[in-house]
Amino acid sequence: LVAVCVSLLGAANIPPQPLNLYQLMNMIQCANTRTWPSYTNYGCYCGKGGSGTPVDDLDRCCYTHDHCYNDAKNIDGCNPVTKTYSYTCTEPTITCNDSKDKCARFVCDCDRTAAICFAKAPYNTSNVMIRSTNSCQ
């Protein structure tokens, strides 16, 4: 209990995240041995936004995920950033469970595909924190 309280105090300066982001992070942990923060500032597309040409296969995973979320917005009333869904994780297998909610199923598939892609793609440490360089213009 003390550890939980201390961790909550340390998190006081962290802005709240959409619930879907937590689901994506958990999927990444399910499919992968690398932790999700490794992907927050990777390449030109991993993290918030993106521009330029993806620098490698892992960055292409993020580029594809961004476009998948854009496609989800074409489903009536679907906001992929806030949409939550049901899935199961039996490491490293992820199964999306929402069969009737088209938006939830689509967003879950976007996140599932990204998590699997991250697990398969090589991680090149020289592509971390490169957005401020000319590589992403």
UniProtKB/Swiss-Prot annotation:
Keywords: Blood coagulation cascade inhibiting toxin, Calcium, Disulfide bond, Hemostasis impairing toxin, Hydrolase, Lipid degradation, Lipid metabolism, Metal-binding, Neurotoxin, Presynaptic neurotoxin, Secreted, Signal, Toxin
Localization per record: Secreted
One Gene Ontology CC term in the entry: extracellular region
Cross-referenced InterPro entries: PLipase_A2, PLipase_A2_Asp_AS, PLipase_A2_dom, PLipase_A2_dom_sf, PLipase_A2_His_AS
CDD domains according to UniProt: PLA2c
Homology family: Belongs to the phospholipase A2 family. Group I subfamily. D49 sub-subfamily.
BP terms from Gene Ontology: arachidonate secretion; lipid catabolic process; phospholipid metabolic process
EC number: 3.1.1.4
Primary site of residence: secreted
Positions that bind tridecanoate: G49, H65
UniProt enzyme class: hydrolase
Reactions listed under catalytic activity: a 1,2-diacyl-sn-glycero-3-phosphocholine + H2O = a 1-acyl-sn-glycero-3-phosphocholine + a fatty acid + H(+)
Name assigned to this protein: Acidic phospholipase A2 1
Cofactor note: Binds 1 Ca(2+) ion.
Cleaved signal peptide residues: 1-11
Function: Snake venom phospholipase A2 (PLA2) that shows anticoagulant and neurotoxic activities. PLA2 catalyzes the calcium-dependent hydrolysis of the 2-acyl groups in 3-sn-phosphoglycerides.
Subunit structure: Monomer.
PANTHER family: PHOSPHOLIPASE A2, PHOSPHOLIPASE A2 FAMILY MEMBER
PROSITE patterns, A to Z: PA2_ASP, PA2_HIS
Positions of Ca(2+) binding: Y45, G47, G49, D66
The protein's required cofactors: Ca(2+)
Disulfide pattern: C30-C89, C44-C136, C46-C62, C61-C117, C68-C110, C78-C103, C96-C108
Tissue specificity as recorded in UniProt: Expressed by the venom gland.
Cleaved propeptide residues: 12-19
